[in-house]
């Protein structure tokens, strides 16, 4: 075995030393004029550019974020107590880079790639700039490969594809993060690499999220990038860009990547804080004038690459917080206009016990059925119609209106569909089981059962299939469509299932 130092083979270290250029270098230096609140004003850095990394004499790193005639504004990646007026600042003429690689999977890190989970050193495979150009039109291909969230409402009515950007928005405590975590948990079965970017989150929340991912076996294919409210604003500002850069590295290798930004409302607030500290001219609601560009540039980096570039994909799930259900405020409307659709979580539905509290009427996926398997398309169209009719007719019930039998039947069907769409946290369901569930609802197989027993019937029926007819589930998993033969089998098996399991309890 080769001798190692700090986990690296001796021959690699020797090679690096030989390759290093020891010749003198000309370096542009400046001096700190003023420092405070995580930002510094530096003079004499005349050749500095936006996004350049600089180093203070104490070793603290920073990034240039504003340019003036006689000085530049720098955000600090460390505590400003280690920087004082008159300190020397060294220009690097480089864009900030972050480490990435497979070694980061299963770890919790800060936006600079430093581990913060006590798990030891991470040896990167590469360093990548945090700011890259989005793939061009010619580098992309249409979004048509489905990304399964395991959430019935989303996979059936608001389908997401690899390479898409789908916004999740709603008030506080309505389940936005839960939807993102469930989507990550679902990816463990499909080999998708996940990156969860937590922006200004409490440490207790991060610990709970990491524990949830570990408990459900999804942490091993996930990188958690965490920033906290008491950290320098610079770390909170670069967090989504750093996560995106790491995701792009895997995408360029042909991998499918999912990145969650939780949340961009806090990121916008951080950018506003930094911009005001740097004395930049405020715009609407005191946000900088380029806040729209900042988020558009970030989210445009999500893409489905064509086969010439490896066919990788980066899917973005940004999260935004609304206040009192108002989605027409500045940041949410910006993000709605940038993304390829939104999933809106309704406080009233949440309080009524409907989980996930997705308002189907205000939610949309602009990719639509092109990112949905044929089997789901076969059942989802009827599902949406039944649900829409139910909610329309249910309004008349509130006024005690007399309804004919056909209308009552539609209402009863709608109640069962709505019950079927309810789903507990982290109860993700494979796509083939979802297709079967909706087939039963559409076909009227559940009409004779009380609403409160609908989910129990479906769960037991799927368990019955696994036990006696696993080939049906295997076919659906592989072919993802309801052929005539499979429909015939599902129908006959359900009759057999009823006789064996529900012979004496139907309708009770």
Curated annotation (Swiss-Prot):
Keyword Cell cycle: no
Entry keywords, A to Z: ATP synthesis, ATP-binding, Cell inner membrane, Cell membrane, CF(1), Hydrogen ion transport, Ion transport, Membrane, Nucleotide-binding, Translocase, Transport
Task of the protein: Produces ATP from ADP in the presence of a proton gradient across the membrane. The alpha chain is a regulatory subunit.
Catalysed reaction, written as an equation: ATP + H2O + 4 H(+)(in) = ADP + phosphate + 5 H(+)(out)
EC number: 7.1.2.2
Protein residues bound to ATP: 170-177
GO (cellular component) term, any one: proton-transporting ATP synthase complex
GO molecular function: ADP binding; ATP binding; proton-transporting ATP synthase activity, rotational mechanism
Membrane-topology annotation of the record: Peripheral membrane protein
Superkingdom in the source lineage: Bacteria
A biological process term (GO) from this entry: proton motive force-driven ATP synthesis
Similarity field: Belongs to the ATPase alpha/beta chains family.
Assembly and interaction partners: F-type ATPases have 2 components, CF(1) - the catalytic core - and CF(0) - the membrane proton channel. CF(1) has five subunits: alpha(3), beta(3), gamma(1), delta(1), epsilon(1). CF(0) has three main subunits: a(1), b(2) and c(9-12). The alpha and beta chains form an alternating ring which encloses part of the gamma chain. CF(1) is attached to CF(0) by a central stalk formed by the gamma and epsilon chains, while a peripheral stalk is formed by the delta and b chains.
Residues the UniProt record annotates as site (Required for activity): 363
Protein name per Swiss-Prot or TrEMBL: ATP synthase subunit alpha
Compartments where found: Cell inner membrane
């Amino acid at each position: 075995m080769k001798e190692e130092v700090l986990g690296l083979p001796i021959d690699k270290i020797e090679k690096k030393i030989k390759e290093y250029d020891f010749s003198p270098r000309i370096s542009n230096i400046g001096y700190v004029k003023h420092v405070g609140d995580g930002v510094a004003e530096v003079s004499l850095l005349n050749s500095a550019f936006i996004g350049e990394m600089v180093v203070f004499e104490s070793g603290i790193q920073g990034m240039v974020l504003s340019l003036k005639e006689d000085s530049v504004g720098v955000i600090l990646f460390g505590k400003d107590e280690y920087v004082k007026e008159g300190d020397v600042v060294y220009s690097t003429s480089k864009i900030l880079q972050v480490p990435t690689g497979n070694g980061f999977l299963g770890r919790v890190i800060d936006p600079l790639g430093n581990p913060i989970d006590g798990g030891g050193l991470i040896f990167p495979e590469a360093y990548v700039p945090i700011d890259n150009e989005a793939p061009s039109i010619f580098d992309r291909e249409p979004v048509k490969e489905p990304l399964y969230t395991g959430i019935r409402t989303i996979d059936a009515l608001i389908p997401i594809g690899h390479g898409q950007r789908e916004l999740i928005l709603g008030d506080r405590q309505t389940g936005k993060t839960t939807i993102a975590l469930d989507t990550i948990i679902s990816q463990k079965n499909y080999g998708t690499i996940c990156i969860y970017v937590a922006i200004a989150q409490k440490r207790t929340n991060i610990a709970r999220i990491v524990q949830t991912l570990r408990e459900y076996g999804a942490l091993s294919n996930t990188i958690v990038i965490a920033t906290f409210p008491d950290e320098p604003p610079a770390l909170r500002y670069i967090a989504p860009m750093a996560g995106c850069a790491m995701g792009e590295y895997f995408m360029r290798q042909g991998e499918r990547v999912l990145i969650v930004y939780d949340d961009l409302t806090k990121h916008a607030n951080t950018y506003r804080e930094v911009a005001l500290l740097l004395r930049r001219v405020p715009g609407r609601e005191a946000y900088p004038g380029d806040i729209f560009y900042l988020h558009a540039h970030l989210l445009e980096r999500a893409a489905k690459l064509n086969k010439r570039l490896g066919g990788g994909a980066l899917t973005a799930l940004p999260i935004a917080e609304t206040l009192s259900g108002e989605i027409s405020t500045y940041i949410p409307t910006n993000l709605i206009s940038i993304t390829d659709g939104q999933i809106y979580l309704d406080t009233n539905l949440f309080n009524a016990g409907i989980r996930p509290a997705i308002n189907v009427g205000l939610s949309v996926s602009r990719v639509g059925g092109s990112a949905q398997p044929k089997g789901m398309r076969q059942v989802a169209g009827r599902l949406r119609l039944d649900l829409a009719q139910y909610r329309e007719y249910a309004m008349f019930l509130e006024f005690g209106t007399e309804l004919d039998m056909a209308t009552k039947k539609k209402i009863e069907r709608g109640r069962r569909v709505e019950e079927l769409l309810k789903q507990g946290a982290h109860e993700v369901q494979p796509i083939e089981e979802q297709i079967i569930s909706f087939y039963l609802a559409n076909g009227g197989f559940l009409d004779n059962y009380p609403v409160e027993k609908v989910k129990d019937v479906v769960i037991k029926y799927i368990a019955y299939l696994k036990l006696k007819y696993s080939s049906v589930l295997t076919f659906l998993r592989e072919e993802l469509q309801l052929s005539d033969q499979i429909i015939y089998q599902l129908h006959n098996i359900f009759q057999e299932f009823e006789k064996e399991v529900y012979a004496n309890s139907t309708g009770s």
